[in-house]
Design a protein with these regions (language model features):
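Generic start-of-chain signal for non-secretory N-termini
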Residues: 2-5, 35-39
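Extended non-globular scaffold/tether segments
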Residues: 230-241
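N-terminal export signals
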Residues: 3, 9-32
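Short, Lys/Glu-rich amphipathic helical modules
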Residues: 250-264
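Non-transmembrane amphipathic alpha-helical segments
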Residues: 205-219, 243-254, 272
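Extracytoplasmic/secretory soluble proteins
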Residues: 272-280
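Conserved catalytic cores of very large enzyme subunits
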Residues: 37-229, 260-267, 279-792
Length: 792
């Protein structure tokens, strides 16, 4: 065998089918003779194993690279860190897996979204646990302590906090929204990316390389552009190295396997070797390529899967390489791998809708994907169907059949309504808006054209409480929000609404500036190559995704408590202004007592008009609350320096978490209990039936935000026995402007029974808000919130 001197030699030999163990000694000897570290920085034959001293040594090397390079050469820093990270991150192929790619982030890593942060991240909890591991040597333990100290100051999140302007630091004084009673809080992450996996499957690694080389040979570009293109080629080499490294490990498993499992592992090995150098030619190769790229990039959503896998699926069927059952087996394994990443609030897989380049083939894939979802019946991926009046109606019918089995998927998105809404909200033409995709809990993004990380939360019910207490946080006694003189003479309904709106704007303004600051700091600390190479227009511009590369740089802000706030205004108007049963001071006193001794007055508040009953007295106030915050937030985009900045009215259990920090509200809600879910009515408040409820939830303007979600709960008896009536009901809802529906379909009494006998309901999956979960795994407070919802 020829001498192996360089990484290129190493890749070439692995590409010819040689196992890692056969060539690693020669490569390591070459590195040692040159005075470099073994394997140019990582132990190639080791995955994330139980050797904690080795893990610490690699984390120390990762930290050293960051210390030496990040401020002077961010592009090389990312590549060198990823060389160390990927062998620590990727795990062995487990029994039953049909693809490689299980992964777990090491406790210090680079990712757009890890450990509730983005960029260069640390899990202090995991590092502290590592420090106490009895197997660690004294030297390794000291290294861990030193790294905790370093990263507490030099993580991307910590470095961003150091450059908060004074007003931002004052207004956004805490990000601990899960336990502090905050009106608004920043989130530090770069989430919601939707990579162009169709381009990846059409071009492969070699095609991407040729596109970059074409830019380099054009003779155009600044020195910074040229550096980006050259570094991108190195990043592609690193991806190929990773795939071949993985293939070598799988080859060793092949040698030990037999029968069907041997053939399965051999196919994994062959796909890994193929995608390292060429575009995928089969469904198996494409799935393997996409999943590995997703893990390397840190992206946790999976785009329009029917578009990028549809052609290969159809071709495989035509060539008799696979059957439909083979495809279902592959997708079942993929669904399991997606679930293994534990990205509960993301993991979107999209099928259907307008704008696909290969609708016929894509639809055929969509059917097999729905069948897989029906059989696997998992919490994730968050399987989503886009539909329109012009597409094959059988897709929608099949979706209802799957939902009728008690599966919360697919979620339904109405293109006929959403595309025009996105055109207005994002200020883009139809050709761009047709590529909208929901990610995460329901936020819209323009597929591989825009980013819009939700990097802030705002609690409107908390802001109303602050307003009623004239700038004093009831729970903490802290004075915050607008200046106290703005409350002078606050007595009328219009006065209260004015002060409330000024407070909302006070927080939204700083959250918008924070979003842009996040892009300018965390977003610019690394080029995030594996995102940049699959986002328009990073390669052509020669710039990283968050640093001038992406076509549309946007942001989103998560709003909570909209319904409680609107219903509270309805109670104030009715009881204080119209009927004069209470003065404003009396109402505030009752709220401060959490209704203790004021049961009659609480019933007045509970009986006041509520959103969700097709009653314009309440619904008009919900429209006003939404229109104000959505409109003001949308106008902050240009001031903050982004293409878009939009509210999202979604839910990721934050209605429960933030409600537990929110005092009593005038809608009759008790202190420190859950808030209403997203665009839905307060649980049990929709008393006029399903038609009235659906008429209410289409009233807020959907053309000024980036997505709102609504849950609907049907009994299996209603949904299945009266299917034609249910279809007519949903058809009327979507025809009246309904954008989206997440449907829970369950037997009457199932939820209560599951709380009493959880062992009997281990497979009861429910739609919580922006995510699904096994009902028995949810906290009791969340179970109670779901139980409060009306079951039709």
């Amino acid at each position: 065998m020829a001498s192996i001197q360089t990484r290129r030699d190493f890749l070439k030999v692995l590409g010819n089918g040689v196992m890692v163990s056969a060539v690693l000694p020669s490569f390591l000897a070459s590195c040692a003779s040159k005075g470099t570290e073994a394997g140019e920085g990582h132990r190639m034959v080791n995955m994330y194993d139980d050797d904690k001293n080795y893990l610490v040594a690699q984390l120390k090397r990762f930290t050293h690279v960051h210390q030496q390079m990040q401020k002077s050469d961010r592009m090389r820093c990312e590549i060198e860190c990823m060389k160390i990270q990927y062998p620590l991150m990727f795990c062995e192929v487990e029994p039953g897996d049909l693809f490689a790619g299980r992964a777990k982030y090491p406790p210090v890593c680079l990712s757009p979204q890890a450990f509730d942060s983005g960029g260069y991240c640390i899990s202090v909890g995991a590092m502290s646990k590592l420090e106490s591991d009895p197997e660690l040597s004294a030297e390794a333990r000291a290294d861990v302590r030193e790294m905790i100290g370093y990263w507490s100051q030099e993580s991307s999140r910590a470095r961003m906090r150091k450059v908060f302007p004074p007003k931002m630091a004052e207004v956004l004084y805490s990000d601990n929204w899960t336990s502090d009673p905050l009106c608004g809080a920043p989130l530090d992450r770069l989430s919601g990316t939707q990579c162009d996996y169709d381009k990846l499957c059409r071009l492969g690694i070699d095609g991407l390389r040729k596109e970059i080389e074409s830019c380099l040979s054009s003779g155009k570009g600044t020195p910074e552009n040229i550096e980006f293109w050259k570094s991108s080629l190195i990043a592609l080499d690193l991806f190929s190295e990773m795939a071949l490294w993985y293939a070598g490990h799988v080859a060793e498993m092949v040698e030990k396997a037999s029968g069907i499992r041997k053939a399965e592992l051999k196919k994994i090995e062959e796909s890994l070797r193929h995608i390292a150098v060429a575009k995928p030619e089969t469904l198996h190769e494409a799935i393997q390529l996409v999943f590995l790229w997703a893990v390397m990039s840190g992206s946790i959503n999976y785009g329009r899967m029917d578009e990028y896998l549809g052609d290969l699926y159809v071709n495989d069927l035509a060539a008799k390489r696979i059957t439909e059952e083979d495809a279902i087996a592959m997708l079942s394994s993929l669904w399991t791998l997606i679930d293994s990443r534990k990205t509960t609030w993301d993991a979107r897989v999209i099928v259907g809708g307008k704008g696909r380049r290969n609708e016929t083939a894509a639809d055929k894939f969509a059917y097999v994907a729905m069948e897989t979802t029906k059989r696997v019946r998992g919490v994730i991926p968050q399987f989503t169907l886009r539909f329109s009046s012009g597409q094959d109606p059988r897709l929608y019918e099949t979706a209802l059949d799957v939902i009728g089995t008690g599966n919360p998927y697919p979620m339904l998105y109405n293109d006929d309504v959403i595309i025009p809404a996105v055109m207005n909200a994002f200020r883009v033409p139809y050709e761009e808006a047709v590529n909208y995709l929901p990610f995460g809990c329901g936020e819209y993004i323009l597929y591989h054209r825009s980013v819009g990380t939700p990097s802030g939360v705002i609690n409107l019910a908390q802001i109303l409480s602050l307003t009623l207490h004239k700038g004093v946080n009831f729970t903490t006694g802290r004075r915050e929000g607008i200046p106290s003189e703005r409350y002078d003479g606050m007595q009328t309904f219009d006065d209260i609404m004015r002060c409330y709106k000024e407070n909302v704007e006070h927080y939204v303004e700083q959250l918008a500036y924070h979003e842009k600051l996040e892009y300018d700091t965390i977003g610019c600390e690394a080029p995030y190559f594996y995102l940049s190479l699959l986002f328009d227009d990073c390669i052509s511009r020669g710039k990283p995704v968050f640093d001038g590369g992406v076509r549309y740089l946007g942001g989103t802000l998560e709003a909570y408590g909209n319904t409680n706030t609107a219903d509270s205004f309805a109670a104030i108007r009715k009881l204080v202004c119209d009927e004069k049963k209470l003065t404003l001071d009396q109402m505030v006193k009752i709220l401060d007592a959490d209704f203790e001794g004021y049961e009659k007055e609480r019933m007045w508040m509970l009986d006041a008009p509520k959103y969700g009953n097709d009653d314009d007295y309440a619904d008009a106030l919900r429209v006003e609350v939404d229109s104000h915050i959505c409109g003001f937030t949308r106008e902050m985009a240009q001031k903050a320096g982004m293409h878009s900045y939009l509210i999202v009215i979604i839910n990721n259990n934050a209605n429960v978490t933030m409600g537990e920090q929110t005092p009593a509200t005038p809608d009759g809600r008790k202190a420190y209990t859950f808030l209403a879910n997203a665009n839905a009515s307060t649980g049990g408040a929709d008393k006029n039936g399903i038609t009235a409820y659906l008429n209410s939830i289409v009233k807020p303007d959907i053309t000024i935000h980036a997505g709102a979600v609504q849950n609907m709960a049907f009994s299996k008896e209603t949904f299945n026995t009266y299917r034609e009536k249910t279809k007519a009901l949903l058809s009327a809802y979507f025809g009246n402007g309904g954008a989206q529906a997440m449907i829970n379909c369950m037997g009457r009494g199932d939820l209560q029974a599951a709380m009493e006998h959880p062992e009997r309901y281990q497979n009861l999956i429910v739609r919580v808000g922006g995510f699904s979960a096994k009902f028995v795994d949810l906290p009791r407070s969340t179970q109670l919130e779901i139980l409060s919802r009306t079951l039709y």
